Curated annotation (Swiss-Prot):
PANTHER family in alphabetical order: ATPASE DOMAIN-CONTAINING PROTEIN, DNA-BINDING PROTEIN-RELATED
Gene3D superfamilies cross-referenced by the UniProt entry: P-loop containing nucleotide triphosphate hydrolases (3.40.50.300), Winged helix-like DNA-binding domain superfamily/Winged helix DNA-binding domain (1.10.10.10)
Similarity comment: Belongs to the archaeal ATPase family.
Bilayer-crossing regions: none
Name under which the protein is recorded: Uncharacterized ATP-binding protein PYRAB06260
Keyword Transferase recorded: no
Residues annotated to bind ATP: G28, P29, I30, N31, S32, G33, K34, T35
A single MF term (Gene Ontology): ATP hydrolysis activity
Upper classification of the organism: Archaea, Methanobacteriati, Methanobacteriota, Thermococci, Thermococcales
Pfam families: ATPase_2 (PF01637), MJ1010-like_2nd (PF21690)
Top-level taxon of the source organism: Archaea
Protein keywords: ATP-binding, Nucleotide-binding
Amino acid sequence: MFFDREKELSKLLKIIESEPSLITFIYGPINSGKTALIQEFIRKMPDHYVAFYINLRATPITKYEDFIDILFSIEFENPIKNLKEALSLVISAGKEILGIPIPNDFLKQILSENKPKNAFLYITKLLTEVKRRGKRPILILDELQVIGDLRINGPLIYEIFNFFIHLTKEAHLSHVFTITSDSLFMERIYSEAMLQGRADYFLVDDFDEKTALNFLKSQGLTEEEANLALEYFGGKPPYLIEAIKHREELEDYCKKALAMRTRQVYSFAYGKRRIIKLLTEFKNKEEVPFTGKVTRTLEEAVKANILFVDPLNGIIKPQGRLELLAIREALRMLT
């Protein structure tokens, strides 16, 4: 559900007004509304744009062939015979096409050769033709971290970054947006020397208090009910939606949600002094400084979806309000 992200939406629409020059990395805590924002962004784009949207989490990716399958995963009744047919499909698709259309024979060739360069050359050629037809192409990859460790004659992610740099900084052919909820992956990207001066970073955080209250009240909750939901769930959109669904037993639902999350945090931290020490930093604080060093302890807490690292703003914080409360409850049980 999309609600009141006009500021973020306006910024995204402003980005595509200018010539492509930077890769835009969209990041934020889990379930903060990144994908909902990008879908609304696509809907609000002017008609002369076309977005190629690829969700890398659509199916498991364990090897290069899986990545190629998702990249070019478009199902049509009849196989695509040539570039002209692929181009026709893009032009007639409207403002969004899920995946990149490719002639069947060429797809087989790309899969047999195991050379990402050939796949990227084809995409460049297709985007060039799309632009010649008066459309402005936009490439969007959701859940980019899924391929972070994939290798094909070396790490695939570096070849992808080089390709994105070519599309934006060098050829000015297409805007490129990537989306991730993995803050460790985001920290790795932010520290990557090859991306310095070639990338921009766009934080999509949970709703602030005012927006969350307005959302809850717009869905029929009273001031008292809205404040109760906010106390437990902060501005995490999916949690707020669930709170609305459980309005009839809202207080009981909130308490049960916190109890469950507390058990998860307790189980994660039990018997681990270094984890407990890290979590103790949030006993009286909602966020702490991030020095730039990712310790094994911090990595574990982030992978467990308990903490979120924001390398751009230099902070570490719980993934959301519920996690903050659960950390504090678990600490009372552990110490």
